[in-house]
Regions:
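Extended amphipathic alpha-helical segments
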Residues: 1, 48, 52-63, 86-115
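Surface-exposed patches in structured soluble domains
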Residues: 4, 22-25, 31-37, 108, ...
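Amphipathic alpha-helical coiled-coil segments and their boundaries
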Residues: 39, 46, 50-53, 70, ...
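Short, charged beta-turn/beta-strand-edge "cap" motif at the junction between a beta-strand
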Residues: 45-46, 173-177, 219
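Structural microfeature recognizing short secondary-structure transition sites
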Residues: 123-124, 178-219
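Low-complexity, intrinsically disordered
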Residues: 145, 164-180, 206
Length: 219
């Protein structure tokens, strides 16, 4: 059967703000470890935004205290303020809005550095330093090349001969070594063409690439 190799783990990573890219630490094909730094944005504007929002939040907290004290509550213990009264006081003081803006600014700062979510290989990295980050598309993709799987189909009348765990041999059409694997998933649905989708885990030692066309033989 004809099949295609796909990575079991794949993550499209993107920046959440369009600041200028300051540093790129990796390139396509590099192997990275979970938690490894991939790229940074210029953080000057983000730092200013975070500092300003933090100041605004502190000011709103003081305003909130003034509102509650003005209503006769003790500044030493606001735990006795009724929930509805506290809700209205937070709106009047601008506390909730200031807190929301601070949390957003804090998140933007935390996401100004891209980190590898798992061990894998870098792919589809085309951005360059000193250019604004494009938030509408992925900055790069991390592929878990150790955990590859072959997606293929079999005829419905062949389904009775396939079981979970059955051995398979994967041969790339591009040539080279054949690799062994085992059936890991059988989709319990026959499509309009009388075909059933099957997946097989492949132990390729990093020698197969996602998207490769292969021939799959079930043993």
């Amino acid at each position: 059967s004809n099949g295609k190799i796909n990575a079991r783990g794949k993550a499209d990573l993107r920046f959440e703000t369009g600041e200028v890219i300051a540093h790129i630490y990796v390139k396509n094909g590099d192997r990275v470890q979970k938690g490894q730094k991939l790229a940074d944005l210029d953080k000057f504007r983000l730092e200013q935004k975070l500092s300003q929002s933090e100041d605004a939040l502190l000011k709103a907290e003081l305003e909130l205290k003034d509102v509650l004290i003005g209503q006769g509550y003790s500044p030493d213990d606001f735990s006795k303020v009724p929930a509805e009264t506290m809700k209205i006081a937070k709106v009047k003081s601008g506390y909730e809005q200031s807190k929301s803006q601070y949390e957003l600014a804090k998140r933007d700062m935390e996401h100004a550095t891209l980190i590898a979510p798992f061990d894998g290989v870098v792919a589809n990295l085309f951005s360059k330093p000193y250019n604004p980050a494009n938030i509408s598309e992925a900055f790069c993709t991390i592929i878990d090349s150790k955990g590859m799987e072959a997606d293929f189909t079999v005829l419905e009348n062949e389904l009775a001969f396939i079981r979970m765990g059955d051995k398979v041999v994967i041969t790339p059409y591009a040539g080279g070594d054949a690799f062994e694997g085992s059936v890991s998933e059988i989709n319990p649905l026959v499509d309009a063409n009388g075909m059933v989708k099957v997946k097989a885990l492949v132990n390729a030692g990093g020698k197969l690439f996602s998207g490769m066309n292969v021939r799959v033989s079930v043993r």
